[in-house]
Amino acid sequence: MSSTKQMHIAAFLMRHGHHVAAWRHPDTDLASNPFTLFREQVQSAERACLDAVFFADSLALTNGIPALEPLTLLSALAASTSHIGLIGTATTTYNEPYTVARQFASLDLISEGRAGWNLVTSDNAAEAANFGR
């Protein structure tokens, strides 16, 4: 019996790139609407036949740079795409199971089955402080 394996490719998107100083690059448009940028990037990834896009999340500021909340962002992006997978992060440390299930079920319904969950636990002191722990 032969088995065909297929690699799945996803893009991990961040507003100004993955380097901590990427926001300082002269070509970086700090005034632009991040949703417009992400919509263009995700549509490009879809045209390139990538399987999914991924947005990380933190319940605290990362390097002092604000970020859009991924489930809201992915729900909006679902309306601008047709087949690319939409993966977002949610921590089980500070979210109740029912809430996470409801949020991802909503994204899955809105996107017609394209939702994915990056399940994480949190050990970040800044996140803990935001929850009084």
Explain the meaning of each model-derived region.
Residues 53, 86, 115-117:
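Hydrophobic residues within beta-strands of alpha/beta enzymes
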Residues 58, 89, 120-122:
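Histidine-centered beta-alpha loop that forms part of the nucleotide-sugar donor binding/catalytic region
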Residues 4-5, 12-31, 93-133:
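Flexible, glycine-rich active-site loops centered on histidine and acidic residues
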Residues 1-81:
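N-terminal beta1-alpha1-beta2 module of alpha/beta enzyme domains
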Residues 60-63, 90-96:
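Conserved short loop/turn motifs at secondary-structure junctions
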Residues 80-88:
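Conserved catalytic cysteine-centered active-site region
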